[in-house]
Every structure is written in C-alpha cells, then in structure tokens.
Regions:
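Catalytic cores of nucleotide-sugar-dependent glycosyltransferases that transfer UDP/GDP/TDP-activated
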Residues: 1-294
C-alpha cells in the first residue's frame, strides 16, 4: 500500500528499448516521456544500449555539450564508453547510450558476483541473455559514475529498470550505491510469455503453475531467475496492470509493491480527420499484405 508520495530529484530509467524501437515498451516509455520531462526537466535521464554504432540512429540526437565534463570523467577514470544526447520524441529527454561490449571480458566474474549476492542463476544462459545482462550491468555502472561525479547523498535519486533485461544493473546498484532507490518494473513476466508462446493456457491455469518448475521445463531458467531475484531484492517492485500482477504473484512468488498503470499522452491517438485518414491507410496496407498471402 502506498502511504506517502515522495518526489525524487533525479530519475534514471533504463531499458533495452531506449532509442531502440523493438516493441511495446518503446511505446510505453516514449509516450509518457513528455509528461516526465515537463515535471523534471533535465534531471530525467533515459539509459539505453548503444547498438547503432557506426550507423545513423534517427531516434538519437547526439550532443557534445550535454554532461561533457562527466562524460570525459566516465571515459578516463571509470573506463565507460557512453554517448549523450536527446531522444527524438516529444519532450526530447536526455539519453545516455551505453557501449557495453567491454564488459563481456568480465562476464564470468559478473555472473559469479550476482550468484553470490543475489542467487541469480546465469548458468543456463543462451540467446540474448548475455547481451542484455552486459548492457544492464554497464547501465548500473554508468549511473554509479554519474551519481558519484554529479550528485551528493542529499540528492534523492531513483533508478527504474524495465524488464528482466535491466535487472542486473538494478541489483548492482543495490550494493554499489544503496543511496539510489531502485525500482524494477515488469510489463509481463518472461515465463508467462514463454508459457503462452508454447501454446499453453496461461490464465486458465495460472493458479496451478509454478514459475521455477515451468522455467526448467521451457528452458527459461536464467531469464526467470534474474527477473524473480530482481523483483525480490529491489527497493520497489512494480508492474503495469492487475492482470500482470496476478502473473507476478503466481510465477515470481512476489506481488508488486505498487501497480503502475500504463498511460500515454492525450494526443497519442489522432483525432478527427487525421485519425480517419491514418486508419484508412493502415487498413489498405493490411489488406494489401493479406492479399499477397492468399
């Protein structure tokens, strides 16, 4: 239950989909950024992976002036490679893109630390687990560096990590910079997605599923582990609806501390003739694709 509403001085939000349009989380973050930017101005920082190296990213507007002194310090003193600029969306919030490639050399040591401190099982990792985890850990190191260089213990800072891909960074900050409050937000559980993706009835039998057992059955142990352990160890665990909260209770053995309902700006859905025109064009495209599949 929420007893008090406290306003932080600084907000750091980490996601694999910052300046990297992949799916629904990009929409969630980008369509509320304007409201956050209005409230917090340039004390709001989004952190994403620098996966467009050597290519022009239309979603990222790089700046040589933003955080210039810290960026130089992060490179020379903390061995971190970052690019700073603005997200090319309404509100234009500050973005820090992180090059995480150098952390692969420390992967085994990082995973060992996470097992010893938080019992995160990375032994069964495959696919995108390593890449996401190295980004997540690097994002945590970046926030630590920024905090040590620019802020003091009197500054109230929050780190919000979205989805299992950013869990490692949140756990790192729990011990490295406990002054920063950590929030972990799941938009749908990884094991829930896997259950549904394997054509099993998720919600009809949700009460009967054991998350750990299903993770083993579906070869999802590591992703499930980082998600579950992050949910249990961060300062505040949140999800985006009562439906996903039911997933969390059953599959992660942890109900959300707060349910943060998804929201978007009033102008997200076009109005009037603009909406009608876009609807017609979208329908035409869908019919064209469907006809080609016949």
């Amino acid at each position: 239950m929420v007893k008090d509403l406290l306003t932080p001085d600084y907000i750091f939000e980490a996601s694999w989909e910052v300046c990297n349009k992949v799916g629904g989380i990009y929409t969630v973050l980008s369509t509320r950024a304007n409201t956050l930017q209005t409230a917090f101005r340039d004390k709001l920082f989004f952190i994403g992976p620098d996966v467009w190296q050597g290519k022009d990213n239309p979603l990222f507007i790089e700046s040589d002036n933003l955080c210039a002194a810290w960026k130089e310090h992060a490179c020379e003193k903390d061995n971190l490679s970052v690019r700073v600029g603005r997200w090319n969306i309404p509100g234009n919030p500050i973005v820090i893109l992180v090059d995480f490639q150098s952390f692969f050399a420390e992967k085994n040591e990082i995973y060992t630390e996470m097992w010893n401190r938080f019992q995160v099982d990375s032994l069964h990792a495959y696919g995108d687990y390593d890449e996401a985890s190295m980004f997540s850990y690097a994002a945590g190191k970046v926030v630590e560096s920024f905090y040590r260089y620019n802020l003091t213990e009197n500054d109230k800072a929050v780190y919000q990590a979205h989805e299992w891909m950013t869990g490692l960074g949140a756990l790192y900050l729990q011990t490295a910079v406990p002054e920063i409050a950590t929030i972990f937000t799941t938009h749908a559980t990884s094991i829930g997605r896997s259950i549904a993706g394997n054509n099993k009835p998720l919600y009809d039998y949700l009460f009967a599923y054991n998350g750990d057992q299903m993770a083993g059955e579906l070869n999802m142990q590591s992703k499930h582990s980082i998600e579950k352990q992050t949910a249990h160890y961060v300062d505040c665990f949140t999800t985006v609806s009562e439906i996903t909260n039911n997933e969390c209770k059953e599959l992660l053995d942890k109900a959300a501390d707060v349910v943060l309902m998804n929201g978007f700006e009033d102008d997200f859905v076009p109005k009037g003739s603009t909406f009608t025109g876009k609807r017609k064009r979208a329908r035409s495209v869908m019919l064209n694709v469907a006809n080609k599949l016949l």
